[in-house]
Regions:
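Conserved donor-binding loop and adjoining core beta-sheet/short helix segment
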Residues: 1-43, 136-158
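Acyl-donor-binding surface of acyltransferase catalytic domains
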Residues: 31-87, 180, 204-208
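Conserved acetyl-CoA-binding loop-helix of GNAT-fold acetyltransferases
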Residues: 34-47, 158-173, 190-195
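Short acidic/polar active-site loop segments enriched in Thr and Asp
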Residues: 54, 176-178, 199
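Conserved active-site alpha-helix within GNAT-family acetyltransferase domains
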Residues: 61-72, 163, 185-203
């Protein structure tokens, strides 16, 4: 299943994130413009259902506020601490990508607003050098995605290792501030970030549940 970056009809333009349908049954619609919003939303939702989506969420238009909120995506940040315990970082390679993707997609399966990654998406991360394993004493503690000053994703493979995995990913960051993006209803992640000292700086995006619009 492939995403559709530009989905167009006579009524509007949107991006459809469909890659997670085989994993979670979820589809995400980002509306870019709409001349007839209600009609266009129905067209988008109808298409997502046709390709197998069981839950459908949308963002990007003020008229979506009439629908139930599924998730607000928060921006959080903190100064990068000094002298914290860190494990070893290993960049993901083409040879280790399958293992990394398996950990990522398994760990993200039940995370609110998370998107499953395809093999092609994984290859793009490898090319950019932004995907990592976190190891300690030969054991995989977790994985992550780091871009510039932002930790884009983190998965802990061992109970209680989340803080160590995050601290280790700090080593791949640029600058003195670390940022994360997290769904407001992702309780475990919010609790981890707050315990570490992250503070909320804003709402980046609000997803609305449009599964039952017609």
């Amino acid at each position: 299943m492939k995403d559709i970056p530009v989905f167009t009809t006579d009524d509007g333009v949107a991006s459809l994130a469909l890659q997670q349908i085989p994993h979670t049954g979820f589809a995400h619609i980002t509306v870019h413009s709409a001349s007839a919003f209600s009609d266009f939303l129905q067209e988008c939702v109808g298409f997502c259902r046709t390709v197998g989506a069981e839950r459908i969420f949308a963002c990007g238009h003020k008229d979506l506020e009439q629908y139930p909120i599924y998730a607000r995506v928060l921006s959080m940040q903190m100064p990068i601490p000094e002298d914290v315990e860190q494990a070893c970082l290993f960049p993901v390679t083409v040879e280790s990508l399958d293992k990394w993707l398996d950990i990522y997609n398994t760990g993200m399966k039940d995370v609110p607003n998370a998107v499953a990654l395809s093999k092609q998406a994984g290859k793009e991360l490898v090319e950019k050098g932004t995907a990592y394993f976190v190891h300690e004493n030969g054991n995989v503690l977790g994985i992550g995605v780091v871009e510039d000053d932002t930790v884009r994703a983190i998965v802990s493979c061992q109970k209680g290792a989340g803080e160590l995995v995050m601290n280790s990913l700090f080593g791949a960051l640029c600058g003195d501030i670390v940022k994360v993006e997290v769904a407001e209803n992702n309780g475990p992640a919010i609790n981890l970030y707050q315990r570490m000292g992250f503070v909320t700086t804003g709402i980046l995006k609000t997803w609305y549940d449009v599964t039952k619009i017609f």
